Amino acid sequence: MPELPEVETTRAGLSPRLQGRVLTRVIVREPRLRWPIPPDLDTQLRGLTLHGLARRGKYLLFDFGAVTQLVHLGMSGSLRLTEPAEPAARHDHVDWRFDDGTILRLRDPRRFGAVLLTENAPGHPLLAGLGPEPLSTAFDAAYLHTQCQRRKTAIKPLIMDAHVVVGVGNIYASESLFHAGIRPGVAAHRLSRAACARLADAIKQVLTAAIAAGGSSLRDYVQSSGELGYFQLQTRVYDREDAPCRRCATPIRRIVQAQRASFYCPTCQR
């Protein structure tokens, strides 16, 4: 699933090409995504100028003035800039055509993504209850420690909860816990303030490094240019079961938490 670094990389790649452009047409080939694409998407957006492109958690927010388009990439989605001569492939479900000839194309093989419209983005049900951005000053040791003290759940599911902090998916949760020296199964309420400080810093550092690497391309994700992300080449524990730890050579272990695979080093993480 595209996580915060992949979505932020997509936003950064699209924004300079699309901001200020006028949308001339929307072509919907397959409206049946996680939620049905609004049937009047083309009617509502045609002729509008894209004023800006922002991100909230794993959602992209296309600001068309009176209306905002929300896009979620789901499990397998990607947004790419294409030329008019490039034919649509099987899983290319939506095209947004702009006045300079640029086409923004949504590819989503598993169709778990979403394209929605709203006149009140901050108050939209999908956004209103989200936690702070992990790279913001609102997410720090004090905040994380307070959240941990309220819950007896394991720490990895907690930092993957978008109501606690947005955008920390499975890959980056495992990597952040490794850098903080914390096992994924440790009860959140048992973490000290110092441990929460290490973890908050690790989350920021891992996400920043992943954005710089263009995200992780494990299955379907590509950047808006069509290039792959490369963070998966530098992971310390994720998807490395039985491989030697890059720090101490202990075999990496894999466990399942909330139906998700977690990876950790039993020596480096306590």
Curated annotation (Swiss-Prot):
Question: Which cofactors does this protein require?
Answer: Zn(2+)
Domain of life according to the entry: Bacteria
Q: How is the cofactor bound?
A: Binds 1 zinc ion per subunit.
Q: Where is the active site?
A: P2, E3, K58, R260
Please list the residues that bind DNA. H91, R110, R151
Keyword Secreted included in the entry's annotation: no
**Which reaction is the catalytic activity of this chain?**
Hydrolysis of DNA containing ring-opened 7-methylguanine residues, releasing 2,6-diamino-4-hydroxy-5-(N-methyl)formamidopyrimidine; 2'-deoxyribonucleotide-(2'-deoxyribose 5'-phosphate)-2'-deoxyribonucleotide-DNA = a 3'-end 2'-deoxyribonucleotide-(2,3-dehydro-2,3-deoxyribose 5'-phosphate)-DNA + a 5'-end 5'-phospho-2'-deoxyribonucleoside-DNA + H(+)
Concerning CDD domains, the annotation shows: EcFpg-like_N
Iron-sulfur recorded as keyword: no
Q: Where are the zinc fingers (FPG-type)?
A: 236-270
SUPFAM superfamilies annotated for this entry? Glucocorticoid receptor-like (DNA-binding domain), N-terminal domain of MutM-like DNA repair proteins, S13-like H2TH domain
MF annotations from Gene Ontology: 8-oxo-7,8-dihydroguanine DNA N-glycosylase activity; class I DNA-(apurinic or apyrimidinic site) endonuclease activity; damaged DNA binding; zinc ion binding
GO BP annotation list: base-excision repair
Q: Which UniProt keywords apply?
A: DNA damage, DNA repair, DNA-binding, Glycosidase, Hydrolase, Lyase, Metal-binding, Multifunctional enzyme, Zinc, Zinc-finger
The enzyme's E.C. designation: 3.2.2.23, 4.2.99.18
Summarize the subunit comment.
Answer: Monomer.
What the entry lists under PANTHER family is as follows: FORMAMIDOPYRIMIDINE-DNA GLYCOSYLASE (PTHR22993:SF9)
Function of the molecule: Involved in base excision repair of DNA damaged by oxidation or by mutagenic agents. Acts as a DNA glycosylase that recognizes and removes damaged bases. Has a preference for oxidized purines, such as 7,8-dihydro-8-oxoguanine (8-oxoG). Has AP (apurinic/apyrimidinic) lyase activity and introduces nicks in the DNA strand. Cleaves the DNA backbone by beta-delta elimination to generate a single-strand break at the site of the removed base with both 3'- and 5'-phosphates.
> Which protein family is it in?
Belongs to the FPG family.
Q: Which HAMAP family match?
A: Fapy_DNA_glycosyl (MF_00103)
Q: What is this protein called?
A: Formamidopyrimidine-DNA glycosylase
